[in-house]
Amino acid sequence: MKICRFNENRLGVVDGDEVLDVTEALSVLPSYEYPLPGYDPLIKHLDALLARIETLIKDAPRILLADVRLLSPVANPGKIIAAPINYTRHLQEVLADSAINNGVASFTQHIKKSGLFLKANSSLAGAGEGVALSHQDRRNDHEVELAIVIGKTARNVPREKSLEYVAGYCIGIDMTVRGPEERSFRKSPDSYTILGPWLVTRDEIDSPGELQMSLKVNGEVRQNANTSDLILGVEELVEFASSFYTLHPGDVIISGTPEGVGPVNPGDAMLAEIERIGTMTIAIRSV
């Protein structure tokens, strides 16, 4: 199932070029008192939510997908975990381009040496919200990635069981301000983590390591790769992340970008696509 959030926090199921409004299904979520939990309640109770949705779909109001404003399908992740260089060809382009590596040795190490990093939750936005470019005196780059949404609490999960802890998948855009500062700092301005266009539940993608992905800017193909080229695949990423962090429902792991990263400017439009997930268009604007 393809689950989306749209407009003023409405809940929808995507069916072709339409969205079925199933916001009523949110009634299955429990109410909370302060302090609020450190996980996403919708993802935590996804099974109950899906069961309720099934009872609503037949009579749900239908809206054209083109007429809705898509928000991030995960509203409250406990953390956003990001993978640095996780494609060999991306490592090669980083080594070759001083505008990317800025002469910092740690920026030219692949994931097995550099580990993972965190992005600020406040950087999260949906496809319909677009990207507000920060620090336009610097180069701002796009990076398309497969995003993994954790479905249940996980700690020290072996790779052979790791997919059991996944709720589903999205397209992720990891925007980056180029410079010498630490990755987390340069990748965490507001709207620099785009998640969307919706959450595709795990049952619809049995082989996340075999997905074709691409990104175009103003119609020009910039990135085109397959998740089979990941250095650490989805299973290994969940294993690796859970060996350092306790993963909670709604935590997001963005798996790293392939080669072809490049700059964007206000007025540009990015079209990102991942096989079996869908496509999303993201507008670039000034802050």
Swiss-Prot record:
Do you know what upregulates this one?
Induced by 3-hydroxybenzoate.
- Identification of the protein by name: Maleylpyruvate hydrolase
Catalyzes what? 3-maleylpyruvate + H2O = maleate + pyruvate + H(+)
Activity versus pH, per record: Optimum pH is 7.2-7.7. Optimum pH is 7.6.
Temperature dependence per UniProt: Optimum temperature is 30 degrees Celsius.
Give the family this protein belongs to, as stated in its UniProt record: Belongs to the FAH family.
This entry's Gene Ontology molecular function terms read: maleylpyruvate hydrolase activity; metal ion binding
- The UniProt record lists the keyword Cytoplasm: no
Explain what switches its activity on or off, per the activity regulation comment: Activated by Mn(2+). Inhibited by Ni(2+), Cd(2+), Co(2+) or Cu(2+).
Describe the protein's quaternary organization and the partners it interacts with: Homodimer.
The record lists the lineage as:
Bacteria, Pseudomonadati, Pseudomonadota, Gammaproteobacteria, Pseudomonadales
